[in-house]
């Protein structure tokens, strides 16, 4: 039964593919394989055809582990702050103002509307870090306009879905907060390391739009002159009015982290207050919006923490079954040394992203590859490794058949937009 840990991992993946909630898949698998692999059933007088691999008493520290590594974790306090900030900004009207202004600013160019979606996606990512909110908001606002001006359905949908996922990599990303906790790296270091790659990714999206506009002009036409109704000083004033609020929030949150003025948790709290001030400035701060924002924040934060509890139980049982030793032995014996390990782990994460969500990969796979990465690359390179993982996880929102950004988009798109 030395490979019982691999059966446990396979059972968890199978439950996730069937559609069971992540927390219950991980926790339920932990309970099942505790019964199979521990001395619990033999202690009740039931004989097993194999020797128990660990004593049930080993799990007595599970409550302490949950409260010590989850409930008392100061870093994870940043999660509800960033979620609150993102949801509140969604309700503040920031996206509407940005899309309208950027559409007028870039509208004279072929592909200008698509470029404006990428720019707004990057600004929303640096302001909110919530992928679902960004994709849905831009799909509701930009997709009808793009289709109206004869943009191809494929380009319109692809640009909106891809730009919305920039919130995965451009800080303040909730994914980076969770990933930093899982690999033992400062969230501030991950934010700093991911900022430039995130902007480069947005730049590559713009280059792709420009390439499509040059090679297939009918797919991305320029806006007609009558649609660009602002020029000169009026356009400049509108651009400044649209850009200053999100840039202020970006500087408030990321600037304080990068320059060491505040921790990510403290910056998240300031960002939450800043989002409320922006909503007040746009006359969108109502009691209903505030209650809705708090409700969504509690729901998403609770989901993350319940998954953490299930992942902690899964990790403890997997380790008790000596799964960590099997993983270490396998990864350390891959051909190519550290580069073979890097290629294999990145390929594995990418392929898993076709079938399971980023949060499942973060809680199931990352904790077991992080110690090997630390051994190969050293602590000074772990932020770099974390950013690579985050970039890879970002693709899980787009890769079919379970790309969540595609389903967010389809949920608000007109019937003419199909997933096939």
What are these regions (language model features)?
Residues 1-420:
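Alpha-helical transmembrane segments of multi-pass membrane transport proteins
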């Amino acid at each position: 039964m030395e490979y019982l840990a691999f059966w446990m991992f396979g059972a968890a993946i199978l439950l996730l593919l069937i559609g069971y909630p992540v927390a219950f898949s991980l926790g339920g698998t932990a309970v099942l394989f505790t019964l199979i692999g521990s001395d619990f059933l033999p202690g009740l007088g039931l004989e097993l055809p194999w020797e128990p691999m660990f004593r049930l008493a080993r799990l007595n520290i599970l409550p302490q582990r949950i409260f010590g590594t989850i409930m008392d974790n100061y870093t994870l306090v940043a999660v509800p702050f960033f979620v609150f900030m993102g949801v509140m900004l969604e309700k503040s009207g920031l996206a509407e103002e940005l899309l309208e202004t950027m559409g007028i600013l870039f509208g004279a160019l072929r592909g200008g509307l698509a470029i404006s979606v990428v720019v707004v996606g990057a600004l929303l990512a640096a302001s909110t870090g919530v992928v679902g909110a960004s994709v849905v908001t831009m799909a509701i606002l930009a997709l009808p306009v793009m289709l109206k001006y004869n943009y191809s359905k494929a380009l319109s949908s692809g640009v909106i879905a891809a730009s919305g996922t920039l919130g995965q990599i451009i800080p303040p990303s909730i994914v980076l907060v969770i990933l930093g906790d899982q690999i033992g790296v400062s969230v501030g270091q991950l934010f700093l390391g991911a900022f430039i790659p995130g902007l480069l990714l947005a730049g590559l999206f713009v280059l792709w739009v420009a390439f499509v506009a040059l090679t297939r002009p009918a797919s991305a036409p320029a806006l007609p002159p009558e649609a660009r109704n602002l020029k000169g000083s009026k356009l400049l004033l509108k651009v400044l009015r649209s850009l200053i609020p999100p840039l202020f929030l970006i500087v408030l949150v990321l600037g304080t982290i990068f320059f060491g003025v505040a921790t990510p948790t403290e910056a998240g709290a300031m960002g939450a207050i800043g989002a409320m001030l922006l909503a007040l400035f746009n006359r969108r701060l109502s009691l209903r919006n505030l209650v809705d924002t708090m409700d969504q924040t509690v729901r998403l934060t609770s989901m993350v923490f319940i998954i953490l509890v299930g992942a902690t139980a899964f990790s403890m049982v997997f380790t008790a079954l000596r799964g960590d030793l099997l993983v270490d032995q396998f990864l350390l014996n891959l051909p190519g040394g550290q580069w073979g390990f890097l290629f294999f782990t990145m390929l594995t994460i990418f392929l898993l992203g076709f079938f399971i969500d980023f949060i499942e990969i973060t809680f199931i796979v990352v904790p077991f590859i992080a110690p090997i990465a630390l051994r190969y690359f050293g602590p000074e390179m772990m932020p770099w490794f974390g950013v690579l993982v985050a970039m890879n996880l970002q693709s899980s929102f787009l890769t079919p058949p379970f790309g969540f950004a595609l389903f967010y988009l389809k949920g608000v798109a007109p019937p003419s937009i199909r997933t096939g």
